[in-house]
A protein has these predicted regions:
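Conserved DHp (HisKA) dimerization/phosphotransfer helix of two-component histidine kinases, i.e.
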Residues: 1-22, 29-46
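Conserved micro-motifs of the catalytic ATP-binding
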Residues: 22-25, 64-67, 129
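Conserved catalytic submotifs in the C-terminal HATPase_c
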Residues: 53-63
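Short beta-strand/loop element within the Bergerat-fold HATPase_c
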Residues: 90-101
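Short conserved segment of the HATPase_c
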Residues: 114-126
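Short alpha-helical Gxxx[C/S/T] motif in the catalytic ATP-binding
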Residues: 137, 141
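Detector for a conserved hydrophobic position within an alpha-helical segment of the HATPase_c
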Residues: 145-146
Length: 169
């Protein structure tokens, strides 16, 4: 009906508006462990309802991040929700500092892999493989990481696991 089309179009326009207006990050120093634990708590109901478990593993001690905590929380919640929607049962967030002093955060899940065709498109605004999706989550997340002079990429997706990597330089 016209009403449904109108609602869909409004949703699209709102999504586009949100995508094009990412606020400049308000950065401060914080320990990543606290943020990871908050993300796990914020997504707990959704993970439990789907039979999944989300955990945090600190591979380097006391990972201190200088970033916009709210924006990074938004990225991680999006990645956890995507994992749940991909029918993951195990979702793991890890953080480490590499030899170049970059902070590497991985979000790994054992859900359905992302098809080779979709891997090329998942960061394109409004691309979605989901019935209810808007296709802005990953695009917005990548934009936020760029504003942090970092990157967000899909580093692996096969029958065993899917891994998204955030790198803070």
């Amino acid at each position: 009906t016209i009403s449904e089309s109108s609602k869909g179009l409004n949703k699209f326009v709102d999504s586009h508006r949100n995508l094009t207006r990412v606020a400049a990050p308000v950065k401060k120093a914080f320990y990543f462990k606290g943020l990871a634990e908050r993300v796990i708590n914020l997504t707990r109901e959704q993970t439990i309802m789907s039979g999944a478990i989300c955990t945090y593993v600190e591979k380097s001690e006391d990972v201190l991040l200088y970033a916009d905590e709210g924006q990074i929380t938004q990225i991680l919640i999006n990645l956890v929700k995507n994992a749940v929607q991909a029918e993951a049962k195990n979702i793991e967030i890890t953080a480490e500092i590499n030899l170049s002093e970059h902070i590497i955060i991985n979000v790994t899940n054992d859900g359905n892999p992302i098809s080779k065709e979709s891997q090329e498109e998942i960061f394109v605004p409004f691309f979605t493989t989901k019935q209810e999706g808007t296709g802005i989550g990953l695009s917005l997340s990548r934009q936020i990481m760029r504003l942090h002079n970092g990157s967000l990429s899909l580093t692996k997706s096969d029958d065993h696991s899917t891994v998204f990597t955030l790198i803070f330089r």
